């Protein structure tokens, strides 16, 4: 069975990110902190932070990263969270936190971020934590949480503007305009 692929352009991702920002603004939520999850969540987080600032909501913002690896003789993956110390040192229970990524897939990374924040922040964990992603895959979600803000639902394999891994040369040249010419300069 062939999995359908949805190719997302940089402009589409940017506009969807601004749309998310307007959704967040219209909901009345005013985050004190915005966290973009490296890699895909960072450009989305930047656009959301920019449009919220334009609309009068200044916020602190930072990127964090998650990684997965297989432990020795283990069948399950553990998700680790990196770069969260700034949040732990600066957030309070009264703050509002927005976690931003490009897609909500299984939810494992979000669960790891929330669990790490709870463990390390203890009483300082913000009481209002929300999530925003342009894309949501409800059938892949394995946790008891859904994003508060999203634009699209899909089961397709999403190919974001920066992604090349897992694509054939034919797919890259057909779906990533101008990349053939750029790659022709590789020595």
Please provide the spans of the model-predicted regions:
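PRPP-associated nucleotide enzymes
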Residues: 1-187
């Amino acid at each position: 069975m062939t999995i359908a692929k949805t190719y997302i352009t940089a402009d589409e991702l940017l506009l969807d990110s601004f749309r998310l920002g307007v959704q967040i603004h219209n909901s009345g939520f005013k985050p004190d902190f915005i966290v973009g999850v490296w890699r895909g969540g960072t450009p989305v987080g930047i656009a959301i932070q920019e449009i919220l600032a334009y609309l009068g909501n200044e916020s602190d913002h930072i990127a964090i990263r998650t990684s997965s690896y297989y432990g020795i003789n283990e069948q399950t993956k553990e998700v680790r969270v990196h770069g969260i110390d700034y949040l732990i040192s600066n957030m309070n229970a009264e703050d509002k936190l927005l976690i931003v990524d490009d897609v909500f897939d299984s939810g494992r990374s979000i669960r790891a971020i929330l669990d790490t924040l709870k463990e390390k922040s203890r009483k300082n964990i913000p009481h209002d934590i929300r999530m925003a992603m342009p894309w949501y895959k409800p059938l892949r979600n394995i946790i008891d949480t859904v994003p508060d803000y999203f634009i699209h639902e899909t089961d397709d394999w999403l190919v974001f503007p920066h992604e090349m891994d897992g694509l054939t040369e034919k797919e890259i040249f057909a779906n990533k305009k101008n990349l053939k010419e750029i790659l022709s300069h590789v020595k």
